[in-house]
Amino acid sequence: MTPLAVIPFRPLNPKSRLSGIMTREERELFAAAMLTDVIGAVTAAGCTPLVLATTPYTVASVRVRVTDADLSTALNTLLRDQDGPVLIMMADIPLATKEAITAVISADADVAIVPGRGGGTNAIYLQQGSSFATDYYGQSFMKHCRIAEERNLSLEVIDSFRLYVDIDEEEDLVDLLIHGTGESAALLRSFGFQPISMKGRVSVIRSSP
């Protein structure tokens, strides 16, 4: 059965922690470009994408479901009706590739989790969507592992650089500029962002495009 790939997305005023280096319009364009990269990767891996948007939004050839509920409530409402496989994939993981996602949806466990930075959860794959309930924010990775255990579901943790890198802070742009080949990396470069070595570390600077 073809996995359903649910991608939560905030179209308006996203990525507020980047507001020091991007205007609101730029952040909205950037978030949309990252979403495009994620949709492309999950589609290439054989999943059917579904965008779970916080406000009305249109994506060509992709179904969009609008909800004003918080993230976990919105996801759990959807999961209750899903007896088939479901991939929950955050929209700010623009380094995602067909190969990285295929590795996740090929897991034999009931639940496969890709951890994110700082204890977060970047992706969850469920053999049966209705078997699970999400609990995002805070230490969501540990909470999701505990939920799998409490429900007697087998669990596999997927170690994936491509799916580990999520974009929230200015320093996160470094990995995207170095490793990214999709629309979001191209957009960043068109904005004038580029990596630079400073005091032995790589940072980003912005020049006039």
From Swiss-Prot:
Molecular function (Gene Ontology), one example: phospholactate guanylyltransferase activity
Taxonomy, superkingdom: Archaea
Coiled-coil region: none
Gene3D superfamilies cross-referenced by the UniProt entry: 6.10.140.50, Spore Coat Polysaccharide Biosynthesis Protein SpsA, Chain A
Pathway as given in its UniProt record: Cofactor biosynthesis; coenzyme F420 biosynthesis
Keywords: GTP-binding, Nucleotide-binding, Nucleotidyltransferase, Transferase
Annotated EC: 2.7.7.68
Catalytic activity: (2S)-2-phospholactate + GTP + H(+) = (2S)-lactyl-2-diphospho-5'-guanosine + diphosphate
UniProt record, GO biological process: F420-0 metabolic process
Pfam families for the chain: CofC
Subunit: Homodimer.
HAMAP family (UniProt xref): CofC
Entry similarity comment: Belongs to the CofC family.
Function statement: Guanylyltransferase that catalyzes the activation of (2S)-2-phospholactate (2-PL) as (2S)-lactyl-2-diphospho-5'-guanosine, via the condensation of 2-PL with GTP. It is involved in the biosynthesis of coenzyme F420, a hydride carrier cofactor.
Protein known as: 2-phospho-L-lactate guanylyltransferase
Gene giving rise to this polypeptide: cofC
